[in-house]
Amino acid sequence: MSEDGDICPICKSSRYLNPDMKFLVNPQCYHKMCESCVDRLFAYGPVTCPHNGCEKILRKNKFKTQIFEDVAVEKEVDVRQRVMSVMNKREDEFDTLNDYNAYLEKIEDSIFTLLNGTADEKDALTKEIEAYEKEHKAEIIANNKLRDEEDKYEQQKEDWMKEQRKANYLMAVEEQRAAQEDKEAAKRELVHQLATSNKDASSIEQNVQKTALKRSSARTVNFQPMPTSRYFEKVKKESSKPETPFTPFNGDRQIPALFEVQDHYDDKVIEPLAHDIQHQAGGFTLKAAYARILQQAFFGLGVDVQTELLAEENGNSNGTAVPVKTEEDPVKLEEPSIQVKVESTV
């Protein structure tokens, strides 16, 4: 005898006689009926629900397979998905954790009202959600897209972790098999040398153990387990401002330069290096060396790190603040005598 859950309430067909029969529900009223009844009753357009006392207008394309046996659970899951697809703000969009928790509580209150509220409360809340969805459509779409990307990332990470665990398991099995083979080979080698060699038994045993230890060490290097985690790049919201680290001293740049490099300086240390063939092969030039020395000497003059930080926080620059202007024109050096000790690393 079939249970009531296996009988279509419309056509009274039984799953006992038709094992392939599928039951469908419509989110409008969640009344169950078989797939054949849906095809037969709703083939020509929307029709009133055939259940006694239900006046909901149903459409064929809204029917779906019932996942949960309890219709109340099925309804709650659908309502929750609907509400959270619209009210989908993220924690980083709130100033404090309390604000985010209040937002989550509002979502739960909305779900409870749609499930257990009066008809007027449900209608009012439905209109409110529809108005919010219309007003924040672009934001909702962006958050849903970001959530899908994060779900995809988590799935990829989980799949990768499974592959790594499987690979590590196979590698451990292979390592264990190789260790057993080496152990048996060492025993055979020990017996063979004891039978054929004239050396002392203790020295033979030590030599065999050393050989086995070398093989074991080499095998351990070859069978290193793969890491069980990977640095996955988290999906982040796109921003017009590049997320680059802050570097002081005007972004490691000094524009305009506070010096001019002359063609010649009286320097007895660096000048001989220009005639060294080893330095010439590496692209060494006197002017480049002098420019580097002067840059190090003048680097950071007129730059206020605190001013740069303030400009960075206020968004007035891209991490590069204009240094404090100290003179109208760059400093011109009239062939100073620069005594710098340079040690060649070549």
From Swiss-Prot:
Keyword Iron-sulfur assigned: no
Gene Ontology CC entries for this record: transcription factor TFIIH holo complex; transcription factor TFIIK complex
Presence of the UniProt keyword Protein biosynthesis in the record: no
A GO MF term: cyclin-dependent protein serine/threonine kinase activator activity
Entry's localization field: Nucleus
Biological processes per GO annotation: DNA repair; nucleotide-excision repair; regulation of transcription by RNA polymerase II
Region listing for Disordered, in residue ranges: 314-346
Annotated CDD domains: RING-HC_TFB3-like (cd16573)
Skewed-composition ranges (Basic and acidic residues): 325-335
ZnF segments: RING-type: 8-53
Keyword list, A-Z: Metal-binding, Nucleus, Transcription, Transcription regulation, Zinc, Zinc-finger
PROSITE patterns according to UniProt: ZF_RING_1, ZF_RING_2
InterPro entries: Cdk-activating_kinase_MAT1_cen, MAT1/Tfb3, Znf_RING, Znf_RING/FYVE/PHD, Znf_RING_CS
Function comment: Acts as a component of the general transcription and DNA repair factor IIH (TFIIH or factor B), which is essential for both basal and activated transcription, and is involved in nucleotide excision repair (NER) of damaged DNA. TFIIH as CTD kinase activity and DNA-dependent ATPase activity, and is essential for polymerase II transcription.
Designated name of the protein: RNA polymerase II transcription factor B subunit 3
Taxonomy of the source species: Eukaryota, Fungi, Dikarya, Ascomycota, Saccharomycotina
